């Protein structure tokens, strides 16, 4: 049987977790085997910016960061489960990638 590998990425971990719980509910309702959600390492994108625009005075810095959270879910590729997966309301700042594997 084919497996569907679902990769979720987003900057807000709470939204990523809500999408994971929706996928888990679909797997329980349809009765397919599910592995995950497996938390992958969080990427931290850090941008240091100089506070003073003119370069005079002491060098003080602001550090801005954005964290990218990732989750990996494997489940059996049942037709009913995949149809319900396509109808999930996914927030705009979360990307979802589904790959079918043998």
Curated annotation (Swiss-Prot):
SUPFAM superfamilies, sorted: Ribosomal protein S10
Signal peptide start-end: none
Protein's name in the database: Small ribosomal subunit protein uS10
Record carries keyword Methyltransferase: no
GO CC terms of this entry: small ribosomal subunit
InterPro entries, per the entry: Ribosomal_uS10 (IPR001848), Ribosomal_uS10_CS (IPR018268), Ribosomal_uS10_dom (IPR027486), Ribosomal_uS10_dom_sf (IPR036838), Ribosomal_uS10_euk/arc (IPR005729)
Family assignment from sequence similarity: Belongs to the universal ribosomal protein uS10 family.
Source species: Methanocorpusculum labreanum (strain ATCC 43576 / DSM 4855 / Z)
PANTHER family (alphabetical): 30S RIBOSOMAL PROTEIN S10 FAMILY MEMBER
Pfam family of the protein (one): Ribosomal_S10
Keywords, in A-Z order: Ribonucleoprotein, Ribosomal protein
Known partners and oligomeric status: Part of the 30S ribosomal subunit.
One MF term in the entry's GO annotations: tRNA binding
Purpose: Involved in the binding of tRNA to the ribosomes.
GO BP: translation
Superkingdom, natural source: Archaea
Coiled coil segments of this chain: none
């Amino acid at each position: 049987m084919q497996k569907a590998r679902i990769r979720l990425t987003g900057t807000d971990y709470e939204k990523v977790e809500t999408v994971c719980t929706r996928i888990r509910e679909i797997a329980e309702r349809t009765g397919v085997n599910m592995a995950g959600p497996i938390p992958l390492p969080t990427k931290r994108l850090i941008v240091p910016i100089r506070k003073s625009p003119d370069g005079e005075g002491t060098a003080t810095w602001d550090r801005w960061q954005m964290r990218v959270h990732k989750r990996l879910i494997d489940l059996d590729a049942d037709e009913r489960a995949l149809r319900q997966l396509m109808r999930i309301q996914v927030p705009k700042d979360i990307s979802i990638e589904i790959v079918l594997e043998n």
